[in-house]
Structures are given as C-alpha cells and as structure tokens.
Regions:
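Bacterial N-terminal signal peptides that target proteins for export
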Residues: 1-10
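Intrinsic low-complexity/disordered segments
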Residues: 3, 20-22
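Bacterial N-terminal signal peptides
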Residues: 9-19
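Phosphate/dinucleotide-binding and metal-coordinating scaffold of catalytic cores
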Residues: 24-302
Length: 302
C-alpha cells in the first residue's frame, strides 16, 4: 500500500557541481537567454563608486549588505537593462581572493522583481580555476546525465565600465529553482555551510539555528524556503539519526528519512571529478531538500 511520506534528498552546490538523482526531478527547464550555450554575453553593473569601495574593502569581505545599482545584459538576443538591482559579494573563501565573485538580486529593492524568470544571478570568479571550464563542464555533464543541476554559462563582467574578466553565470538555487523542477515545490531546503557536520545537537530544533563565530548574519544550517515557519525538525531528525542510530538499525532508520541511493550516486560523481568541498571530505556547502515521495513495500519512487 502506497502512502505519502517526507524524505530528504541531496541538492549540492559548491565549487564544482550540483545535483541529485534524476528520479526526483519532474521538469527540466530550458537554458533560455540568461544561460546562452554558444556565446559569451556581457554583464555590466553600475553603482556609486563609494558603494563599490565599501564592497571591495577587505574589512567588509563577509558583509552581505546589498547596494543599489543598474544591471545591463548584452548578447546577440538584444540588450536588457534592469534598474535598482542589489549588488554584493558572494562566496566563502573566495571573498578574500583578488578576483571577487558577485551576487545580483533583482528583487531586493523591487518587490517581486525578476529578470528572465530569475530573482538572483551568481557571477562566480572561479579564482582557483585558470581554465574557467571545470565548473561548466561538470555541471553540463550532470544536466546531460539527468541530475538536478543549475544552468550555467560564461559572461564578461564589467563594473563601472571596468572589465573584471571572464565569469561563470550560475543559476541561483532557491525556491525559484525548486519550482522550476518539482511539482511539490513546498518542501524545506537548507543551505548548509562550514561547520555543518551533521553532528547531533539534541532534540530541540532550535539548537540547529546557530551561526559560526565569523559570520553572525548567516546560520550554519540556513533555511532557504518556508522561512516564516522556520521549522528545523527535519535537520534535527537527520542529525539525530546519523549520530545516534545503532549499527543494526542505521540503514533502516536513515533510509526512512534520507535518499541514500541518490546521495551515493552523487558522491561517486563528486569523487570522480575531484570535488573536495562536499560532505564526504570537507563540508564547504551542501543543500538538503525535504520533498514528498511515494513509498510502497516493494519499491520507492520519488
């Protein structure tokens, strides 16, 4: 007899790739004009020089304050201009790199604002990849194999008319990302960053809402959807099971709440491509997503 349950699947986003198994994905969005596969578009950001100076000041490296500016996207499809976008640095250790990564928000200063269906744009400098190809190759491979992965393209970045170099334009993983791929888009999704090691912190879900000492603005387990409910019980259940289940019961208890097969498939690909910033090595960033699935006695179908 089949019944609806809730289980955590893995959507990882880090230095190289993102994905989980194809059975969980119900829709595959087209690349569209925001993620051109066969040309390099230009992104031009313009903001007050004093605001840019604040963003680039090393003392403000970990600030997530957004500053107003103008976004211009130039490609063979035409030129789009969006005023009153939010601009800030993004990333973790990359914030201290010479080549910064940036986030552009279309809905910070304009409620409901979007560009080509996107609320955010991630412009990654990929400072540790001289080829500027690793991330795109792996993400495109993941998409071709049916894994859930963000759309991606290369762009030229200009800030206040100064050329900043070739950048990777990576689709932002948020509620919009989920809605484009799942019928059930109401699940909870957490952005987990270092030191999120899935350690058992007890029965109180509030214990998992802590922030690291170096960044009081962002929780280590940051709920990215359903923020008003702020329900951390699923993260608590996962950490509690990982930390306390006996050897005899571990497999059964974990599979009841977590897509083990999908995680192992993804981990195999991450090891193959040398992705170091993941849970099996150095947990830099990962995204567990709680989503409904159907389960029977003889099969599990996401």
């Amino acid at each position: 007899m089949k019944h609806l349950c809730q289980r955590l699947i893995w959507v990882t986003v880090g230095v190289l790739l993102a994905g989980t198994i194809t059975q969980a994905q119900e829709y595959v969005p087209e690349l569209g004009p925001a993620f051109l596969a066969d040309e390099v578009a230009s992104v031009r950001l313009t903001l007050a020089q004093t605001d840019l100076d604040f963003i680039l000041n090393p003392d403000n490296a970990y600030s997530n304050e957004e500053w107003p500016g103008t976004f211009v996207y130039e490609s063979s499809t035409g030129t789009d201009t969006v005023s009153s976008v939010g601009i800030r640095l993004r990333g973790n250790t990359s914030r201290n790199a010479a080549k910064k990564s940036f986030k552009v928000s279309f809905n910070t200063f304009i409620s409901g604002g979007k560009w080509n269906g996107l609320e955010k744009m991630n412009l990654n400098g990929n400072h540790n990849d001289p080829s500027m190809m690793r991330a795109r190759m792996v993400w495109e491979y993941m998409r071709a194999q049916g894994y859930i992965a963000p759309r991606i393209s290369h762009v030229r970045l200009y800030i206040n008319d100064e050329y900043k170099g070739l950048y990777i334009n990576v689709e932002h993983v948020d509620e919009e990302f989920i809605q484009k791929r799942f019928k059930h888009d109401h699940g909870n999704m957490w952005k987990c960053t270092y030191p999120a090691d899935l350690a058992d912190l007890g029965d109180n879900p509030e214990a998992y809402k802590f922030t690291p000492p170096w960044n009081s603005e962002q929780r280590t387990y940051e709920l990215k959807t359903n923020n008003t409910q702020d329900d951390y019980s699923a993260i608590r259940d996962l950490c509690h099971t990982v930390g306390t289940a006996s050897d005899a019961d571990f497999q059964c208890e974990l599979e009841a709440i977590f897509d083990v097969d999908g995680f192992l498939r993804l981990a195999a690909v991450e090891i193959l491509v040398g992705h170091w910033g993941q849970l099996h090595r150095e947990p830099e960033q990962f995204l567990p997503l709680r989503t409904p699935f159907r389960r029977s006695l003889d099969d599990v179908q996401l």
